[in-house]
């Protein structure tokens, strides 16, 4: 399971001209689910993201988590995080989980964040979304449940 985590001042998701989710200060998380992923991957990333200290404390040091700041999380499913561009010019997405498996694990991930006391908004699974964000910093982290990076 892979995540691109961005510290934001605000973010929103629009589908077919309708705003379906919006958050204030917090994290925008793009989540990719791989074929081999399961509940342990969900728990690892939810725990890592909930506790990731990428917000400034009173001394200006990155020392606070989204939970510490009372920030929100916008979780957006993104299978393209499993795009393999090593061969040719067209990405291969064969490592991405099939939709049914990905939806199940995405829902588990959202629930795991909420269980850790976070307010979580979501994109719409398999929808063509417009995601707008105001990146804070910018601060962007790449996470992988297999600890590849």
From Swiss-Prot:
Catalysis: reaction(s): glycyl-tRNA(Ala) + H2O = tRNA(Ala) + glycine + H(+); a D-aminoacyl-tRNA + H2O = a tRNA + a D-alpha-amino acid + H(+)
Superkingdom of this protein's organism: Bacteria
GO MF annotations, alphabetized: D-tyrosyl-tRNA(Tyr) deacylase activity; Gly-tRNA(Ala) deacylase activity; Ser(Gly)-tRNA(Ala) hydrolase activity; tRNA binding
UniProt short sequence motif Gly-cisPro motif, important for rejection of L-amino acids, positions renumbered to this chain: 137-138
Compartmental location: Cytoplasm
Pfam families: Tyr_Deacylase
SUPFAM superfamilies in the cross-refs: DTD-like
GO CC, alphabetical: cytoplasm
Cited InterPro entries: Daa-tRNA_deacyls_DTD, DTD-like_sf
Function of the protein: An aminoacyl-tRNA editing enzyme that deacylates mischarged D-aminoacyl-tRNAs. Also deacylates mischarged glycyl-tRNA(Ala), protecting cells against glycine mischarging by AlaRS. Acts via tRNA-based rather than protein-based catalysis; rejects L-amino acids rather than detecting D-amino acids in the active site. By recycling D-aminoacyl-tRNA to D-amino acids and free tRNA molecules, this enzyme counteracts the toxicity associated with the formation of D-aminoacyl-tRNA entities in vivo and helps enforce protein L-homochirality.
Domain topic, free-text comment: A Gly-cisPro motif from one monomer fits into the active site of the other monomer to allow specific chiral rejection of L-amino acids.
Family indicated by similarity: Belongs to the DTD family.
Protein's recorded name: D-aminoacyl-tRNA deacylase
Organism (species): Moorella thermoacetica (strain ATCC 39073 / JCM 9320)
Upper classification of the organism: Bacteria, Bacillati, Bacillota, Clostridia, Moorellales
